[in-house]
Swiss-Prot record:
This is Probable beta-1,3-galactosyl-O-glycosyl-glycoprotein beta-1,6-N-acetylglucosaminyltransferase 7. It is found in: Golgi apparatus membrane. Pfam families: Branch. It comes from Mus musculus. It is a single-pass type II membrane protein. GO terms for cellular component: Golgi membrane.
Amino acid sequence: MSQLRTTKAGLVACGMICAFIFLYLRNPGPEEAEAEAEAEPTNPAVVECGFYPDELCSALFDGKKAAPQIAQFCKPPQNSEVPARLRTPGNCSRLARGLHFITRPLSAEEGNFSLAYVIHAPRELVMFVRLLRAIYAPQNVYCIHSDENAPKKFKSAMQTFVDCFGNIFLSSKTQKVAHDNLRRLQAEIDCMRDLVHSPFQWHYVMNLCGQEFPIKTNKEIIYDIRTRWKGKNITPGVTPPANSKPKTGQGPPKPSPDENSYTAPNTIFKQSPPHNLTISSGSAHYALTRKFVEFVLTDPRAKDMLQWSKDIQSPEKHYWVTLNRLKDAPGATPDAGWEGHIRATKWRTEAGDGRKGCTDHDAQDTCVYGLGDLPGLIRLPAFFATLEPSSDPLVGVCLERRHRLRALQQAEVPPEPHWQFPQQSHFNSQPHH
């Protein structure tokens, strides 16, 4: 009898421990939360990862303090779904279904408001396809430009992919893209020309690189553009004060992490700006109306400024915001500042208390988003966030699954089976030492 009581006590204790672990991620109380903050990651022989990744992603988005620690151990084998699909012979319909592309407009509003995208494809094909899968809609149109020196294998895979979609095409011109060089700006303008000549009647165009990922759904982006901007361009930036207008030998104003602020010039003008333009400075990211794009492609001031921009640093950070300050430009916002949240940016100076999760810094002094950033990231008003290659892969996985879930929840049409991502999987993981 004594042995039986001991066994029962052991079973009860085991059950309590299991229940505690189950609730540890989901809803810790104040005492548990305090203990989590002080706890150090352990290295058990085997980690119970549960239904991966949805349970863990949910805990990360909810800000459970134990979740990033558990994520250190729960890393399944690298997903090779995208390259496998591109290598497998088959028709394009099978490719779209296999990669879970949404193939119908999800609402009448979206179907009647086409967006265009100019996308710089990185050399990481999987990251690019995941971005395109998230922002893809059959009523939208996508122009892809890549470095002309990209590997032939990458170019071939890219061509195979875009050939399966009538609304995705490669730019008619290629550039040797460098970060601080006119070639990036020229590549985007080349794509815009292709988009204007395409049969798609798009309303706005936005630019992305393959390392970015949407925080907002297509429906949410359209709602913000239509209700807040109402035919205006979005070019966040700043114009120098009237008493500090740059002259020859001076540079344009430098964007500052502190919105609506102006800092000293950082570039030297070899020549005065054409047409006596006042050079503004801001984000290289934009949302532009079709009429404004047509203006950029034909107006002498825009053409002359493009030629003049060859001699300045990071011209893409000055070109769009300067032209959008011209009062006679279609959709212009002459008095705008940093309004318009296109890309989320966390500056290194902001990575203090309450801004945890900054795991690295890129060359532009901005933080790379980590697992600890997810709760705050999804609450930002920005449309997109940059996911550097050094980011934890789970950051992109969680954002992708959340984005697809929200898109289908907002849909006004019944979802097709292939729009859903594969069911969750349950596995144990050997810790990574």
